[in-house]
Amino acid sequence: MKLTVRVISADQHREWITQRSSVSFLQLPEWSNVKVGWKAESLGWFLGSELVGAGLVLYRPVPKIPARSLAYLPEGPDIDWLQQAHPDLAINDWLAPMLAHCRERGAFQVKMGPPVATRRWKADSIKDAMAKWREEEANPPAHLHDVIADWHSVEAQHLSVQLNSRGWIQETANGAGFGDVQPRYVFQIDLRDRTLGEIFAGFNQLWRRNIRKAEKSGVVVSLGQREDLADFHRVYVQTAARDLFTPRALSYFEKMWDELNGAYPGRLTLHIARYQDHVAAATLMVRVGTHAWYSYGASTTADRDVRPSNALQWDMIQLAYSSGCQIYDLRGIADTLNPDDHLFGLVQFKVGTGGFAQEYLGEWDYILRSTWAKAYGLYQARRG
């Protein structure tokens, strides 16, 4: 039987998601309302009348020419990528009707992010690689991909070959490991079949010491409400100035709160660390099914010594665990192992949790209208 693709309602999409162990929060239908400047629709894949896959498509219209757009499925769609549930269906059986639909919608290019893991490295393997720099060994591994993985997926490699053969293209990652809109490398903690005590014991000595130091120093972590987003945002703006990135407006986070929690109360949580009656740090966490993501974080420079960031991560991990989550996701890392790289500190911080680094298949593009795609690429390049 042939697969067909058609628009489904947001409620149909949500019902599909409830039947899954998890999907990316970027594929929630309500996420489209957070993304200002994009149009959106939920697509369903059908075998006859049976819904067998779903995805959120965001359309970015060309300025002044709304009939043409870039179609984007962040960390999606949610389909049978590795032919597990439907072994008789090849990947092109799934993607061809999606491309036809997007072309009918006026898209000149489709960008997607298959949620398919390719390789994993345990924290101990990464630490061993980092140690080679400290010991000044000859030719220490500069990048994560230079280290032999503890696990790799043959099926994912096969999928990559299939996508290439069907005309999908992938932008090469730069030296930091970033070639996509969403991170290709992430750091995660497996919460399954472990007690909280065992998870805590899996942290390195520095992490455990910092969590205890925060508690002894009087750092108090609590859940915030919507009105507390203003406190989070004040610290977030300070963080942006320190780390040299452009901060999002408070209204973005208020919209994120309203949309995610409006559809599913408690999906987005705000965690606030207070020290001496002021906000020292704050974070946002998103949960979908059995997966929890650390989404945004902010911290003051003045209070860094009392380690509120470690305390916040531990608080989020505990909530994820008590909610039945199987994976706690600290999101993106660079693949650098060079201690002189300015992105190394973030890698080192996350490795201290004792989890694992995971590489995804990355984002892929399919050109539907080459002239429009080239013109849009030039426009984006000029914008910087």
Give the residues covered by each predicted segment:
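Conserved, well-structured beta-alpha core segment at the onset of a catalytic domain
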Residues: 49-108
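Aromatic (often tryptophan-rich) hydrophobic motifs at membrane interfaces
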Residues: 96, 255-375
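C-terminal "cap" of GNAT-fold acetyltransferases
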Residues: 185, 189-192, 367-382
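A structural signal for short, well-ordered beta-strand segments and their strand-loop junctions
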Residues: 72, 108-115, 222-224, 272, ...
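A short, internal acetyl-CoA/4′-phosphopantetheine-binding micro-motif in the GNAT/acyltransferase core
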Residues: 75-86, 193, 297-306, 334
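A conserved beta-strand-loop-helix scaffold within acyl/acetyltransferase catalytic domains
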Residues: 3-66, 114-119, 168-304
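Acyl-donor-binding surface of acyltransferase catalytic domains
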Residues: 91-217
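Short, high-confidence coil segments that cap the C-terminus of an alpha-helix
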Residues: 38-40, 104-107, 266, 322-325
